[in-house]
Amino acid sequence: MSWLDKLLPPKIKQTDPKSRKGIPEGLWIKCPSCEAVLYRNDVEANLHVCPKCDHHMRIGARERLDGLLDPEGRYEIGQEILPVDALKFKDSRKYPDRLKEAMDETDETDAMVVMGGAIHTLPVVVACFEFAFMGGSMGSVVGERFARGAQNALEQNVPFICFTASGGARMQESLLSLMQMAKTTAMLTKLSEAKLPFISVLTDPTMGGVSASFAFLGDVVIAEPKALIGFAGPRVIEQTVREKLPEGFQRAEFLLQKGAIDMIVDRRKLREELAQLMALLTRQPADAVA
């Protein structure tokens, strides 16, 4: 027995590994900002916002939609649209192999989920990026699901909301992915002509072709706190201009200060804030909204 073993009380000595077999893995999460060790269930109940420092962690598309939409009357749009390898693209790995890996890891078929439903009884269509699926990259499926979501909003005469979380256009689809920038913005023109609100919610990260196309075209542009928002990443810009960028450059607070976005809203207050905005923009009563 070492001198340390003699000093340590029996209760805090290392537990026998055999006695830990019944403890499930993944019970704890470490906050990437303040590094606090947090109980996973508490973090999930808090919509993946750190209760210690209010850092907004990344959240899955379906989990976000579950916390946003009313439980009744939800329906998914465009889930039957699946990705194809039209260009037979291959870098270090084949595109179908990357797709299969992403599908297995996320249980999604591509990087966007679109649902119709209601927020505080106000009807709406919501598109939500899944960043865990190939970095939320925008390819043909994402563009088509976005377009069908906007079309559904037109047919139902309801507002359209999009939560962005993307690294940009999908490299493996080349020109086809770049075409989605034009496709998505064209659909928003139809919404504008019909005088239907489009609300864009920028989450961490919103970059590349997504930020350069529809992300900033909302009638109201909202961002989550400290979200990274821009076209090229800060390291790429620094290497190009050979200068040190200002502190907080490309963060939501910096963009709000420069007038590039309209407001920053805490994720835990987004449901109520969106309902109030929808009621205001559509001139409907929002009596149910707290």
UniProtKB/Swiss-Prot annotation:
Keywords: ATP-binding, Cytoplasm, Fatty acid biosynthesis, Fatty acid metabolism, Lipid biosynthesis, Lipid metabolism, Metal-binding, Nucleotide-binding, Transferase, Zinc, Zinc-finger. Gene3D superfamilies: 2-enoyl-CoA Hydratase, Chain A, domain 1 (3.90.226.10). The keyword Zinc applies. Pfam families: Carboxyl_trans, Zn_ribbon_ACC. GO terms for cellular component: acetate CoA-transferase complex. Zn(2+) binds at C31, C34, C50, C53. Its cofactor is Zn(2+). Residues 27-290 form the CoA carboxyltransferase N-terminal domain. GO terms for molecular function: acetyl-CoA carboxylase activity; ATP binding; carboxyl- or carbamoyltransferase activity; zinc ion binding. It is found in: Cytoplasm. It catalyses: N(6)-carboxybiotinyl-L-lysyl-[protein] + acetyl-CoA = N(6)-biotinyl-L-lysyl-[protein] + malonyl-CoA. One of its GO terms (biological process) is fatty acid biosynthetic process. Acetyl-CoA carboxylase is a heterohexamer composed of biotin carboxyl carrier protein (AccB), biotin carboxylase (AccC) and two subunits each of ACCase subunit alpha (AccA) and ACCase subunit beta (AccD). This is Acetyl-coenzyme A carboxylase carboxyl transferase subunit beta. It comes from Paraburkholderia phymatum (strain DSM 17167 / CIP 108236 / LMG 21445 / STM815) (Burkholderia phymatum).
